[in-house]
Amino acid sequence: MKPFVRHIIHALLAVLFCTGIGFIVYNVRTQRKLVTVNGLKVEFADSLKFVSENDIKGFLASNYGAYIGQRLDSIKLRIIETMLESRSAVLESQAWTTEDGILHVRITQRAPEIRFDNGSEGYYIADDGYVFPLHKSYTADVLSVHGNIPSMPTSSYKGLAPTSEQRSWFSQMLEFKRVAYSKKGPAKKIDSLWVDNSGDLRLRVANEEEIFVFGAPEQLEDKFAKIDKYFAYIKPLK
């Protein structure tokens, strides 16, 4: 077979192959346009309980509108993600559809580091200092601070604390928790922690009766070391 004939045959085969692939892609896209959403599947990336599957379904129904029965290619996935991420307890969301007509939503909840509550006002802060409201029926298992806590503008406030002084204090409290939980002695086992009327931290260690006036959340290593030394050397002599 002459070379130019071979080249022509190869070219024709390539054209036929590309045409076939194009037809398959076109057919798949055409079929996809005919598929409508018939269900919603919600999954969570963590074990927190700030939002539930029913919460997500209700939120989408109220804010996005009808999606069941809509064509897959008409679902505005980015809008859904943005809506869900407007909720204070949702850190990130991902939305996608599959050929079986299911709208999938994956939720990553905002993880709290410290809970603040004085009985009439309360909120969480995350590791970046983001403030978000307490949940009506779920309490995260994190360090809790009571008493004379900083006041937020509203009970539903979310975002960084409104004043630089509050943001600085929250940053110190996050460092307080990190240092406390890194300890191996009794100071690690904080049972109660509150802010008194003077703004000083006071704490009680689990299974102990002593109340320690910790003061401002600074000089952390030295203060925690003193608490540990008290239980190691002073209390046994009493």
Segments predicted by a language model, with ranges:
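Charged, solvent-exposed interaction patches on well-folded alpha/beta domains
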Residues: 1-42, 59-71, 75-78, 82-86, ...
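Short extracytoplasmic/periplasmic juxtamembrane "stem" segments immediately C-terminal to an N-terminal membrane anchor
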Residues: 37-55
